[in-house]
């Protein structure tokens, strides 16, 4: 099979995407496929037309590869591709929209507030007061369309609030403030289309105190514990919520649903990643291995799902 792996691109997660794409390409080549890697740039359409792949493996993290833009391009070109379609990609890339959909459906997610940069510029005092009154401290400030915790800040003192908001607005035109919940962080990898399978849950323990970009991608700075050290009923609830969230948002192929387990008892969805990392330290490959799928088998399964009608 001829497979083009899209990777790199202009996003803040470029380096991770290059690692994911390289790992995927190596696995596919090892399975006997004819594979090329394409760094997303203005030549992408010409290269895709010239190679004429049977399927495109999207290993792009962040915009424009994860927000529906590249998905729309591939739809126009008539090329099958891995992962979620345009609408699901656009919604899951935007944490604000994701949370609004989750709340409408009654899926638990931490309380949040959101503003545009323009609103903040003319109402800083009122907005900061609203955050402190409604959410208190500590509070999490996020750039809503970034991944890998880029543009995410935990604010523990009032004086840190304004710099955190400014930091988030460096990446996006809006920002969100989210209630800080104390509890274990767990994640659920989900695989499938019409009948998605939730893979074994993983508890994430960061040795830096916060599962940030460095902790995610530096070997030895975090532990992935399977199964999480939580009661069976809590794990069952998280598994059910992961499947519901995946279906609600219209995800396809594979995705990752991240949770904070408030007080060690109440799983709450914090975000959904529609193009999860596929590097040596990534969570989805770890979950797949726990389910009996080695990395090449996982990659092949994702390709097979892309070709399903």
UniProtKB/Swiss-Prot annotation:
Sorted keywords for this record are: ATP-binding, Cell shape, Cell wall biogenesis/degradation, Cytoplasm, Ligase, Magnesium, Manganese, Metal-binding, Nucleotide-binding, Peptidoglycan synthesis
| GO BP annotation list | cell wall organization; peptidoglycan biosynthetic process; regulation of cell shape
Supply the Gene3D superfamilies for this chain.
Answer: 3.40.50.20, ATP-grasp fold, A domain, ATP-grasp fold, B domain
Q: Name one Pfam family in it.
A: Dala_Dala_lig_N
Q: What is its EC number?
A: 6.3.2.4
Ranges for the ATP-grasp domain? Answer: 99-304
Which of this chain's residues are annotated to bind ATP?
Answer: 132-187
**What is the main EC category here?**
ligase
An example Gene Ontology molecular-function term: D-alanine-D-alanine ligase activity
Q: Is Glycosyltransferase set as a keyword in this record?
A: no
Task: Report the sequence similarity comment from the record.
Answer: Belongs to the D-alanine--D-alanine ligase family.
Q: Which NCBIfam families match?
A: D_ala_D_alaTIGR, PRK01372.1
Function, as annotated, reads: Cell wall formation.
- Name the record gives this protein: D-alanine--D-alanine ligase
Name its species. Answer: Moorella thermoacetica (strain ATCC 39073 / JCM 9320)
């Amino acid at each position: 099979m001829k497979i083009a792996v899209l990777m790199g691109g202009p996003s803040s997660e470029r380096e991770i995407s290059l690692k994911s794409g390289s790992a995927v390409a190596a696995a596919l080549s090892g399975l006997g496929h004819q594979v090329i890697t394409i760094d997303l740039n203005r030549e992408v359409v010409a290269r895709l037309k010239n190679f004429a792949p049977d399927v495109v493996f999207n290993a792009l993290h962040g915009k424009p590869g994860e927000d529906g833009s590249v998905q729309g391009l591939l739809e126009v070109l008539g090329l099958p591709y891995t992962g979620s379609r345009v609408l699901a990609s656009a919604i899951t890339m935007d944490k604000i929209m994701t949370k609004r959909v989750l709340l409408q459906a009654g899926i638990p997610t931490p309380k949040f507030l959101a503003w545009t940069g323009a609103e903040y510029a003319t109402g800083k005092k009122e907005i900061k007061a609203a955050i402190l009154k409604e959410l208190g401290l500590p509070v999490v400030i996020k750039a809503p369309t970034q991944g890998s915790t880029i543009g995410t800040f935990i604010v523990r003192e009032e004086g840190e609030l304004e710099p955190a908001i400014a930091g988030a607005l460096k990446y996006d035109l809006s920002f969100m403030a989210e209630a800080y919940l104390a509890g274990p962080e767990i994640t659920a990898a989900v695989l499938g289309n019409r009948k998605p399978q939730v893979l074994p849950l993983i508890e994430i323990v960061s040795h830096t105190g916060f599962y940030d970009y460095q902790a995610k991608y530096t070997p030895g700075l975090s532990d992935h514990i399977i199964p999480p050290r939580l009661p069976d009923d809590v794990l069952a609830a998280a598994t059910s919520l992961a499947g519901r969230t995946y279906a609600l948002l219209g995800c396809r192929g594979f995705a990752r649903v991240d949770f904070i387990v408030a007080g060690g008892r109440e799983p709450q969805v914090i975000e959904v990643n529609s193009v999860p990392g596929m590097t040596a330290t990534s969570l989805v490959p770890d979950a797949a291995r726990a389910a009996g799928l080695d990395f090449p088998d996982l990659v092949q399964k994702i390709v097979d799902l892309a070709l399903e009608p």
